[in-house]
A protein has these predicted regions:
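Secondary-structure boundary elements
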Residues: 109-116, 145-154
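Acidic, Gly/Ser/Thr-rich repeat motifs that build Ca2+-stabilized beta-propeller blades
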Residues: 1-126
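Beta-propeller blade signature
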Residues: 70-80, 130-148
Length: 154
C-alpha cells in the first residue's frame, strides 16, 4: 500500500499508494554517510521477507574515505512504520571500490530468503584491474548472503 522512492543523495521517501497523495514522508535520511557524485550514491533498497514482523530493510550505498560499497540493515521505528531508524544501522558488508564508477547497487531477496547483491567491477573504462574476471575479489560478482544467521556480517 506504500511506494518507496530512493534518491541518489541518500534519502528515501514513502508515499501512500494513492494518486491523490500530495505529501511525502521522509523514511530514511543517510546523506551524512553517502557520497553521491557520478554513479555513486544510495543505490539499492530491499525489504526483508519478514518485514511486516521484524521491520528490517536493507540499503546499498557508496561511502567515502575510503571509497567503498556498504550494505546495511536498518529497522523501522517502533512507533511509526513510515520512518526508518537511522541509528539502527547494522553494516552487513563493506567492499572497497578502486574507482568512482561501476559500483553496482541492486539488492533483492530471492525466494529462499537470501539477500542478493549485485557488485560492479569497481570501475573505470575497460575494467583496468580485470576485477570482472578475478576470482579472488568480490568485485564483479553477485553475492548471496543469509542475513538471518547469527553474525550476518562479512
Amino acid at each position: 500500500d506504500r511506494i518507496f522512492v530512493l534518491e541518489q543523495r541518500g534519502t528515501i521517501y514513502v508515499f501512500q499508494n494513492d494518486y491523490s497523495v500530495t505529501e511525502k514522508t521522509m523514511f530514511l535520511d543517510i546523506r551524512d554517510k553517502v557520497v553521491h557524485e557520478g554513479e555513486r550514491g544510495l543505490l539499492g533498497l530491499a525489504f526483508h521477507p519478514e518485514y511486516e514482523n521484524n521491520g528490517y530493510f536493507f540499503v546499498n550505498y557508496t561511502a567515502p574515505n575510503p571509497l567503498r560499497t556498504v550494505v546495511s540493515r536498518f529497522q523501522v521505528t517502533p512507533d511509526n512504520p513510515d520512518v526508518g531508524d537511522e541509528l539502527s544501522e547494522h553494516i552487513i558488508i563493506q567492499i572497497d571500490q578502486p574507482f568512482s564508477n561501476h559500483n553496482g547497487g541492486q539488492i533483492v531477496f530471492g525466494p529462499e530468503g537470501y539477500l542478493y547483491i549485485g557488485m560492479g567491477d569497481g570501475g573505470w573504462f575497460g575494467d583496468p584491474y580485470n576485477n570482472g574476471q578475478d576470482l579472488t575479489t568480490l568485485l564483479g560478482t553477485i553475492l548471496r548472503i543469509d542475513v538471518d544467521t547469527v553474525s550476518a556480517t562479512l
